[in-house]
Amino acid sequence: MKKKEIIILCGPTASGKSYLGHEFAKAYNGEIINIDSMQVYKETPIITASPSQIYKTEIPYHLYNFLSITEDFSVIKYLKLAAKKIKEIISRGKLPILIGGTGLYINSLVFGYNNIPDITEDLQKQARELHSKIGNIELWNKLEKLDPLAASKINQNDTQRLIRAYEVFKQSGKSIFCFHTLPKEQILSEFNFKIIFLNPERKFLYKTCEQRLQKIFKEGSIDEIALIKKQLIPQDYLNLKAVGVKEILAYLDGNLTLDDALSATQIRTRRYAKRQVTWFKNQIKDKITLKYSNQEECTKILEIFPHLLIERNLKETQNTAPQCI
């Protein structure tokens, strides 16, 4: 029996994923599922460039802006939610289209994940309160005594990984890295994934990054982050690592001008986009890569989407503009 197909549309930030995925879903009876780790948070739809309300009224969107940044979230929790949504969409006779750029989520969904035990809410609270009280260096020192292996692999400045490693050891009595050596578990082995990687020419990508950031800064991201800063204490928004948050907080604290905050965010966004492209090129082998160097070529991708739904040798699509490899 032929496996049902799931589409993953991935690529760097500001590469056109949202627009292309939306048009694709409208044309081919699809529903969209988020596969971006920052777009799950409900407090930050603007800074994370989440789909607009107009988009959401045209077709169903799932797993966007549903979670508070004060809540703990993990790749395993995401996978369970995504698997449930995928099966529901297929049961309705529709096509699941996952859109995003978080490599860990994509890799875990397609190739399997390390089954690390769930952390109790009490332990999560204790770990965060401890970190808030003693800071990164002292928490790293505690981790080194408990789990030298994890401490040797985690930078003292990596707050989220430090807390996570501490939680896992306290919960299980084992290093988080011990779970990485076990066979990976597949959550959707009964389905076939077709991965489409959007890889715009770098100059064009950097231009779209700049345009998006200017729009985001003008359309409410400052107020969005100011509200979070007003309502929450810092330990409550450790999860919020979207590019631009740190820079806007620095502006709100009077440490950067608005122009400097925008400039710093643009630099960090370009670096982030470059890392994403490198990751997708090197880590996802079985994929269709679509290259384009301007908006017109990006839009033309919609013309070849029907061909991508058909099982075929990838060489057949190589001569179709935009370039497919």
From Swiss-Prot:
Transmembrane domains' residue ranges: none
Enzyme class: transferase
Residues given in the record as substrate binding sites: T13, A14, S15, G16, K17, S18
Biological process according to GO: tRNA modification
Cofactor: Mg(2+)
UniProt cross-references to InterPro entries, sorted A to Z: Dimethylallyltransferase, IPT, P-loop_NTPase
E.C. number: 2.5.1.75
Residues where ATP binds: G11, P12, T13, A14, S15, G16, K17, S18
Record field: catalytic activity: adenosine(37) in tRNA + dimethylallyl diphosphate = N(6)-dimethylallyladenosine(37) in tRNA + diphosphate
Alphabetic keyword roster: ATP-binding, Magnesium, Nucleotide-binding, Transferase, tRNA processing
Spans annotated as Interaction with substrate tRNA: 36-39, 160-164
Feature type site, description Interaction with substrate tRNA: T102
GO molecular function: ATP binding; tRNA dimethylallyltransferase activity
Role description: Catalyzes the transfer of a dimethylallyl group onto the adenine at position 37 in tRNAs that read codons beginning with uridine, leading to the formation of N6-(dimethylallyl)adenosine (i(6)A).
Family membership: Belongs to the IPP transferase family.
Subunit record text: Monomer.
Protein name: tRNA dimethylallyltransferase
Lineage, top ranks: Bacteria, Pseudomonadati, Pseudomonadota, Alphaproteobacteria, Rickettsiales
